[in-house]
Amino acid sequence: MAVVSAVRWLGLRSRLGQPLTGRRAGLCEQARSCRFYSGSATLSKVEGTDVTGIEEVVIPKKKTWDKVAVLQALASTVNRDTTAVPYVFQDDPYLMPASSLESRSFLLAKKSGENVAKFIINSYPKYFQKDIAEPHIPCLMPEYFEPQIKDISEAALKERIELRKVKASVDMFDQLLQAGTTVSLETTNSLLDLLCYYGDQEPSTDYHFQQTGQSEALEEENDETSRRKAGHQFGVTWRAKNNAERIFSLMPEKNEHSYCTMIRGMVKHRAYEQALNLYTELLNNRLHADVYTFNALIEATVCAINEKFEEKWSKILELLRHMVAQKVKPNLQTFNTILKCLRRFHVFARSPALQVLREMKAIGIEPSLATYHHIIRLFDQPGDPLKRSSFIIYDIMNELMGKRFSPKDPDDDKFFQSAMSICSSLRDLELAYQVHGLLKTGDNWKFIGPDQHRNFYYSKFFDLICLMEQIDVTLKWYEDLIPSAYFPHSQTMIHLLQALDVANRLEVIPKIWKDSKEYGHTFRSDLREEILMLMARDKHPPELQVAFADCAADIKSAYESQPIRQTAQDWPATSLNCIAILFLRAGRTQEAWKMLGLFRKHNKIPRSELLNELMDSAKVSNSPSQAIEVVELASAFSLPICEGLTQRVMSDFAINQEQKEALSNLTALTSDSDTDSSSDSDSDTSEGK
């Protein structure tokens, strides 16, 4: 009965796709309430007219929604909060970083807290058995790292391999061989995978879940592992005659998987010569390598022998011919590996790199961001002052504009960093805007990389804006990027100050200093000197001079609050001069006169401009004693302006006889010191002759 019903239904379906004529059309008109078409199908005639036909039924394909599709839709309706720090930090004023150093410290603290929580959960799993998450979240539940199978069997070996217990897996394998048990080829290959991936060493983790009652042998092994960490800064190296080689030699039967695993492990741990020799053995046994093994062999060919470029390039081409002979289709990583290796040869590899790029497009492989990153770095020559080789970035951006990318290569997150670096070296702001627009397209922002890459990208981008853009646009970018996107370095703030100077917008300087303090640049001497120099260089309206004086007082407090051992060397004469001048111009004369004591205390020479303004201030207040103090300061450092200041005191102030004698003595001392210095210079000249 079911078969008959199915046949009738198929017959009805086949008739629905044919034009309705005659009796069947009339039948359809009698039953207009019946819908045998999907919602997307339409009638060819309006109801009430002669129906000449119906479009074929189109059943829409099922749409599979992501579990977080609703959250993604909601997230697309809002933009980044430009007034807040990055989202990774908690919404707590005590946990919000104010500088790049604090952000790194907070991220490390957050990761440390996660590791501690995982350690507690996995150390005491019996207290965390209640699963309150709906749906189930596996990473929140305890993980069991200790083997449950105690007997000597192949199942126990498989369990230890799955738990990534390197030493325990090797011990179990040896016990099986001693017991006369034959281990299957599949299990042995899995053990080789484990050994080759970790270089025959226990995998390093941020936390270790060891039982408190571990044996002495295991404790000694952990001590040995900790001692080796100092020598493994740049990764684990392949040791000769290690367990992987020993087990590989003991295998009675080896297949392609066995050879490929060993070759990839040797290349990963920088045993390039051994990998190439093992590939020769694979060919002698008439076996074939897979595409991932060929990718590793390409890297080994470039890194193994110190040969010329032509010889290494010919060997790479030979490996590619082997791939064709073995009917192995290259993938994206094959071409990216070639391009990455070609970067070692700089100018010589440019033409082959373009050939590789054309070849991968010809066989239908879409380049990834890492592909273009390697091309950019290959054509970018830091020693070329004209940057002629960097112009390839324009062709790359014309090809990439508007595209959305998905992760395909581990080096994909380096593209935007290298592209913005080229924009900065070319001083091309329009190109930088194109790169930034590509970053904001779709989910491309995820490829900006880790924290240090993001800081590098945005610092280069904003520095170029400060150099090339109008000041109003620059300030808008400043509000948009800082601190929500990244925390600026002190040099970035200096570039912004220079942009304000060019645009004659010095009234923004007090705000820049306030922001600099929040970002942890209070004790950056180069930044403080730049701010003081810009404020004290010219005279400004009274209200602006008052704001500048307040800023100068704040900087003076910063100098005084730093460690005592740094105070003397961090009080440059330029800063003392600028602070005193700013105090004078704002009418804060008492604070300005107090600055004179700092010149003597730190043995710093005042500038003539400051001494003249101090003399003007003394004249306004009609204070001969202050005027004489200025002369004394100039005389103490034997400045040439001392004589001119003395004449001004004699002509502009009413002084008594005692003050005249003091001035005469100061002038005499200055003359004697000038004579001594001139005689010393003459004697030095004669000796030189």
From Swiss-Prot:
GO terms for cellular component: cytosol; mitochondrial inner membrane; mitochondrial matrix; mitochondrial small ribosomal subunit; mitochondrion; nucleoplasm; plasma membrane. Residues 1-37 form a transit peptide. Pfam families: PPR_3, Rib_mS39_PPR. The keyword Cytoplasm does not apply. Abundant in testes, skeletal muscle and heart tissue. InterPro entries: Pentatricopeptide_rpt, PTCD3, Rib_mS39_PPR, TPR-like_helical_dom_sf. Keywords: Acetylation, Mitochondrion, Primary mitochondrial disease, Repeat, Ribonucleoprotein, Ribosomal protein, RNA-binding, rRNA-binding, Transit peptide, Translation regulation. The keyword Transit peptide applies. Residues 665-689 are annotated as: Disordered. Belongs to the mitochondrion-specific ribosomal protein mS39 family. Component of the mitochondrial small ribosomal subunit (mt-SSU). Mature mammalian 55S mitochondrial ribosomes consist of a small (28S) and a large (39S) subunit. The 28S small subunit contains a 12S ribosomal RNA (12S mt-rRNA) and 30 different proteins. The 39S large subunit contains a 16S rRNA (16S mt-rRNA), a copy of mitochondrial valine transfer RNA (mt-tRNA(Val)), which plays an integral structural role, and 52 different proteins. Associated with the 12S mitochondrial rRNA (12S mt-rRNA). It is linked to Combined oxidative phosphorylation deficiency 51: An autosomal recessive, mitochondrial disorder characterized by intrauterine growth retardation, low birth weight, poor overall growth, progressive limb rigidity, delayed psychomotor development, hearing loss, and optic atrophy. Brain imaging shows abnormal bilateral signs at the basal ganglia and brainstem. Patient cells show decreased mitochondrial complex I and IV levels and activities, and generalized mitochondrial translation defects. Mitochondrial RNA-binding protein that has a role in mitochondrial translation. This is Small ribosomal subunit protein mS39. The lineage of its organism: Eukaryota, Metazoa, Chordata, Craniata, Vertebrata. The gene is PTCD3.
